Amino acid sequence: MAEYCTYEKYVFKKQLETLKSKNGRSTELISLYIPPDKQISDVTKHLREEHEQASNIISKLIRNNVQEALHSLLAKLRSLHKIPENGIVYFTGTVDTGANRTGMVNEVLFPPEPVADYIYRCDSVFYLEPLEEMLRECTTYGLLLLDLREATIGMLVGRQTEVIKHLHSTVPGKQRKGGQSAHRFEQLRRIAIHDFYKRIGDATSEAFLELDPAELKGILIGGHSPTKEEFNEGGFLHYELQKKVLGLFDTGYTDESGFSELINAAEETLQSIDLLKQKKDMEIFFKEIATESGKISYGEDNVRANLEIKAVDVLLLSEELRAERVTLKCRVCGYENKRTRKWKTGEAVPAIGHCPECDSELEVTDVIDTVGELSELADKGDARIAFISTDFDEGSQLMIAFGGIAAILRYNTGV
């Protein structure tokens, strides 16, 4: 099966790429972000106010375009009975389609994570930054912040952080009270520190051991030095969780506000972990090529054939692959054919061309997303789907040398 969010992320990324390529001739493209807790009546009221204000736009063309977009949004809201769990995002407006022509865009996106803020923006481009932030891997990491005063345990799921538990310590400060020897005071202080570390370890273990081991990708520990190092080296975490510690990071805060600081400090570590998984898949692929085991396949037709007989263990797809299977028909002579057209992110979709029989223009009668089709076949055959970045050599080779589509097989099929 595909890893959580893998194919959904690909589809979502494609939608954003399409919207990013659209431009208005003026500030007439509307982006509307509605959080799950927003009242539809409040949004409707706001859009009516915007419609009234738009009547003051000097340019008749821009005024009509903006008001038409607002009419479209109001019509959609009338048919919306409830805001979805993660909120909803609308993009609408008149875009430049080239050759001095324009067209209307009406797109609705259901975000993979909750929309945080209500946003209404009218500009010459669509406002996509909040959705682009959601493209981060939908994985779960444990978070732990600690110093000798407090500890905060939480989780990072996608880009959302959640506090699980907050602990306060009874560790005394470094200034001893009168009547105590320095040695006795330090001894009692070390006992209090040890007890606090144990409380942190027990609470962290209780929180994270409840999760599916495959779901928890790792644990990030932040705080002051040498406190976090002492805790990590002291064996206070359950041994299964200790193996998942990805690194220790300096943070100024150890309450909930320190989570974003910890995540930013660990950014390179988190990125490298995802790339390591991808590199491992590609290493296996190239190893099978080198040993001539026959347990690999590449090229759309061969991979499709192996998927259909459920022989694929891992389906390898380049993140940069954009491909569609199109059915072409000539209305003049009746010629019909199916063809896959490919392009890279940021490139224009290739033109269809002319009929090879009579040189008339071909018409597209059906379009199927190649990645979606192959992913469905992979799911039916219980194959894992791995989207491979081009940010490392082997990932680039998958796109350049193998057309962005390959597979590791369960056995040699001869295909």
UniProtKB/Swiss-Prot annotation:
SMART domains: eRF1_1. InterPro entries: eFR1_2_sf, eRF1_1_Pelota, eRF1_1_sf, eRF1_2, eRF1_3, Peptide_chain-rel_aRF1, Peptide_chain-rel_eRF1/aRF1, Ribosomal_eL30-like_sf. Keywords: Cytoplasm, Protein biosynthesis. Its main location: cytoplasm. NCBIfam families: aRF1_eRF1. HAMAP family: Rel_fact_arch_1. The keyword Phosphoprotein does not apply. Belongs to the eukaryotic release factor 1 family. It comes from Methanosarcina acetivorans (strain ATCC 35395 / DSM 2834 / JCM 12185 / C2A). This is Peptide chain release factor subunit 1-2. GO terms for molecular function: sequence-specific mRNA binding; translation release factor activity, codon specific.
